[in-house]
Amino acid sequence: DFIKSEIGHRTNVIAVGNSGNFVTMACSNSPELFNRIILVNPDSILTCAQTPGRYTKFYKEFLDLPIIGTLLYHIAVSKKSLRKFAKEYAFYNPHLIKKSYIDTCYENAHLGLSPKSIYASVHCNYTNCNIITSLKKIDNSIYLIGGSDLYLEEELLKEYLSYNSAIEYTLIHETKYYPHMEKPNEFLSTVFLFLS
């Protein structure tokens, strides 16, 4: 709807992480609205296909409790937890992690009417969707960009190729989950190369 009402023509889209699932599904439903799609470190196809199980449903109910759930949420999105996530998983070079980045993540985790509900839905697989059929159906150009130092990232990107051989991918060396923040110039040149 946003592309139809605001942009008004075919557009290129860049999506990071699990937001790529929504872009893939939207492109499958309305391919005429999309030109090229760039997915940065998309979730594995197996992760996309996971649905809420018994444990995750219990965890979601637990997080929805007013006092205990809110306490767990605040622990999960504390500055200490965000810093640990950034150092261990998100960034190749921990010296690139700016205090402003952690502050922004922390602030965004507390904005809105119910950020705890979004957190619970994402972590308990309620926002996942199986994209295999969509990947097979899409005829638009799809490019994948990954951080070379994420565990098994190249294998994950090759998994996408097994469902649509027209997909292309590249890895940006010495980056992890946020190559656009760790090596912005290299990321931009890669994007311009894909879009030209």
Where are the regions that the model predicts?
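Flexible "cap/lid" loop of the alpha/beta hydrolase fold
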Residues: 28, 37-69
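Catalytic nucleophile serine of serine hydrolases
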Residues: 17-18, 41
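Post-His helix in hydrolase/transferase enzymes
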Residues: 181-193
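Residue in the alpha/beta-hydrolase core beta-strand immediately N-terminal to the catalytic nucleophile
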Residues: 12-14, 36-38
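Conserved alpha/beta-hydrolase catalytic His-Asp/Glu region
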Residues: 48-51, 74-134
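Conserved acidic catalytic loop of the alpha/beta-hydrolase fold
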Residues: 1-11
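Short glycine-enriched nucleophile-adjacent loop
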Residues: 20-31, 37
